[in-house]
Amino acid sequence: MGVTVAEIKKRLSEADAEEFAVLERALVADERKGVRNALAVAKRRLQAEADEEARLASMYSFERSLCGENPHAVVVGLDEVGRGPLAGPLAVGAIVLPADPKIACLNDSKQVKPADRERIAAEVKRVALAWDVHYIEPSYIDDHGMTASLRLAFSSAVKAIEQAGVRPDVILLDGNPLHLDPREVNVVKGDGKCASIAAASIVSKVERDALMCRYAESYPEYHFAENKGYAS
C-alpha cells in the first residue's frame, strides 16, 4: 500500500529544508492534488521561516555594525511607550541582550500581536544581561515637558542598568537625539532595525500594559485594561 496523502502532509508539515528537498524529489511523480498542495504549503512555510531568520539576523548584525571597531561592545537599547495617552505614565525600557540566543519574532512592538508580545517579553527578560523599565508620571510631564521627561526617563533607565553591574559601551536610542551621553547612537525607526531597541519596545509596552491593567482594578469605570489609557 502506498503512502497516504495524510501521511505525506504530516511529514511535509514537520520537514526542515533538507528533509523537504528529499521529499520533493521523491514526490516529483506523485500527481495527487493533495500531495501537490501539501508540497506548495510546505515550500511557502519554509520560505517564510528563512525570510524571518534573515530578518532577525539582520537586526542583530545591524546593531553590531553601530559598535565601531569593538566586536565585544556592550550595547543597551532604549525605547519608550506612553507618549500622549489620556492616563498613565511614560515608560522607557532599557535592555542589554547577549549575542546569543537570538530571540525569535523580535520586532517593533507595534508589529507584534499582544499574545506574542507577552511571550517575547518573558524571553527577553530571561536571557537579558540586564533590563529595566522606568516610568515618568503625567504630572512631571505636565510640569517639565516631554523632552525633559524623556531625558530623565532614558538617563534613569541607563543608570539602573549600570547599577545592575553592566556598563554599556554603546547606548542605542530610537528616534531623535537626546544628547544624554557621549555613548549615545540614534537610530531612526530603530525598533524595527536593532534587536535591543526592539526588545526595549516590547518589554516597555508589556510592562506598561500590565500596569494599566492593575490601575483598572482601582478605576474600573475608565476601562484601562482595554484602552491602556489611550482615547482610541
Regions found by a protein language model. Give the residues of each.
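RNase H-like, Mg2+-dependent phosphodiesterase core
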Residues: 1-76, 83-232
